[in-house]
């Protein structure tokens, strides 16, 4: 999936600085350091429990329309992002057919009320 930086979400280029991420399977934490500083050093981030604004959509992670719709929804409902947004790809090119030539994704952003 794609990780979209919180600092860029309300900008003219909400995908600026975006990068990729991977979801590790249950049990992988046993192979990783337990110290948060060590995890950060190797680029591992654990998504916290909390309230997330989620929006499923057809589209590509490098197209800004999806995150712009999420940002508009956050603004409309007085929500503030408290972390990076994550665009999870559920169905990719392996699921393309005549009606859909795009990925099916879910953008998730940790939020709080303003």
Regions found by a protein language model. Give the residues of each.
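A solvent-exposed interaction/effector surface
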Residues: 1-114
